[in-house]
């Protein structure tokens, strides 16, 4: 446009001719499938309902907090097949692990509507590239938007590659730093875990004078071993929370008495215990 303007071309006319590049379907009345209803997935689902979309969400591990935050207009799917078959648009909000890697593969794509549009700003490995490329070439998948592009994907005209834009405003950069500092302080002072990638979210209001924060493998019998060790010390448990994520679990135990170094050593020595921290207040 700069060159044409310099040559006296009517820029307004040129710009108007370019509007065909931006033609696309409207969102209102379309169905959005949201795979993963965590903090971000819930927000996306709720906003989409306000845009007039029909939203169907899937998350086999939907937390109580997420469920309470989810709009009543969002329909919860019992299985992925429902999402694949009904959605005009699909957005992914999942961690990548052995269960989710390649979740959008050949079978999933075959079950989708013709011309489906897919957004993956979660993890690149959630999409099987070997299945996605021919689907894009045939038009089965009309468009793929991702911030995990590579050379093979970017050769295709219906792929939009984005940088990671999560903290691309001055405000968000400041907020990220403040949030990280607060969450780190909360862990150091209270043992709470918030927004961890590898560990479960665990928070417990103080109800004792001593707190044990125990990282361990997600194996049976560990809680019994912890409470047995405290019972031998004649220490009563005031409150406790235990949550797991994959192979690991985290337990917070509040008591109203000092816990001896011997008891801490006993708990630390139990099978599958990885780390024990003692906090007091």
Where in this protein do the model-derived segments appear?
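Rossmann-like dinucleotide-binding domain for NAD(H)/NADP(H)
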Residues: 114-206, 250, 265, 280
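A conserved regulatory-domain signal marking ACT and ACT-like small-molecule sensing domains
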Residues: 194, 198-281
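Glycine-rich Rossmann-fold phosphate-binding loop(s) that bind the pyrophosphate
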Residues: 37-38
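Phosphate-binding beta-alpha-beta segment of Rossmann-like dinucleotide-binding domains, i.e.
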Residues: 1-31, 195
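Aromatic pocket-lining residues of Rossmann-like dinucleotide-binding sites
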Residues: 47-48, 112
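Rossmann-like adenosine-cofactor binding region
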Residues: 60-153, 168
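N-terminal Rossmann-fold NAD(P) dinucleotide-binding loop
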Residues: 41-42
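Short beta-strand "acidic-cap" motif of Rossmann-like dinucleotide-binding folds
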Residues: 55-57
């Amino acid at each position: 446009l700069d060159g044409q303007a310099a040559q006296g071309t009517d820029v307004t006319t040129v710009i108007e001719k370019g509007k065909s590049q931006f033609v696309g379907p409207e969102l209102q009345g379309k169905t959005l499938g949201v795979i993963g209803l965590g903090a971000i997935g819930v927000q996306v689902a709720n906003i989409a309902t306000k845009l007039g979309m029909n939203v169907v969400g899937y998350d086999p591990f939907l937390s109580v907090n997420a469920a309470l935050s989810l709009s009543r207009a969002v329909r919860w799917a019992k299985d992925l097949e429902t999402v694949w078959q009904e959605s005009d648009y699909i957005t992914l909000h999942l961690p990548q692990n052995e269960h989710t890697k390649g979740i959008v593969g050949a079978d999933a794509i075959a079950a989708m509507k013709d011309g489906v549009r897919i957004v993956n700003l979660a993890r690149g490995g959630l999409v099987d590239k070997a299945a996605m490329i021919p689907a894009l070439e045939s038009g089965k998948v009309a468009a793929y938007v991702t911030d995990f592009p590579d050379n093979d994907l970017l050769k295709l005209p219906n792929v939009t590659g984005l940088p990671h834009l999560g903290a691309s405003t001055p405000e968000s950069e400041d907020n990220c730093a403040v949030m990280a500092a607060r969450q780190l302080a909360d862990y150091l002072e209270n043992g709470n875990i918030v927004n961890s990638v590898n560990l479960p979210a665990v928070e417990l209001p103080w109800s004792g004078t001593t707190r044990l924060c125990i990282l361990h493998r997600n194996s049976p019998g560990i809680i019994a071993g912890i409470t047995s060790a405290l019972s031998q010390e004649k220490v009563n448990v005031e409150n406790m929370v235990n949550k797991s994520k994959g192979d690991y679990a985290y337990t917070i135990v509040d008591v109203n008495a000092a816990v001896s170094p011997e008891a801490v050593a006993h708990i630390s020595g139990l099978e599958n215990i990885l780390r024990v921290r003692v906090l007091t207040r």
